[in-house]
Amino acid sequence: MGRVGSRGRDGGAGRGHRHGDDGVIYQQHNLVTQLRVVHNVLAGQLGSWSTLGSLGSLVAPAAAQRETARQALAAVGLEGQIDAITADLSGGQQQRVAIARVLVQDPTLILADEPVASLDPRTASDVLETLLRLQRQGGKTLLVSIHNVDLVRRHFSRVIGLTDGRTVFDGRPDDLNETILATIYGAQRAEAIEG
């Protein structure tokens, strides 16, 4: 178990304190699947609303809120799903809803914790490409925790390998070799390489 900090703040300190500049995409989506997509996307703004505003958004989002959600969904290729029940979407679509939820926060830093672990290879590549496109277009900092070395090699320009809380590699994916992978992954090396 590790800790992450940003802008001089320990990410574990002051639980409950809202770090508005940070957006998090979780491995398990963390969506309320019984709700419509629009409500899950707008949940990214809950921290900036009053209790009454939050309840109003849940009952009937205002036109401006719907437009915010529509724009975020358009950025991830799901504009037509704004009123869909989230449970009716595929795993890849649900992960895109989770990304849209982060986009409405407009964070400067996006932390993605194994964002494609539960997805098939094609969908995983599509989701990573979406994240990277949004990072480039929006000037965001993107930090992705991912263990699939094949996906890392195909999609990222920089890799930082950690073992026991210390950096053991910081370089280009092309420079990852068997020795470095053995240092990073130990006994799980084959699983990480094959995905």
Task: Name each model feature, range by range.
Residues W49-G80:
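Conserved ABC ATPase "signature" region
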Residues D106:
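Conserved catalytic motifs of ABC-family nucleotide-binding domains
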Residues I110-D113:
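Catalytic Walker B motif of ABC-type/P-loop ATPase nucleotide-binding domains
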Residues P121-T123:
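Helix N-cap at the start of a conserved alpha-helix in ABC-type nucleotide-binding domains
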Residues S125-Q137:
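Helical segment within the ABC ATPase nucleotide-binding domain
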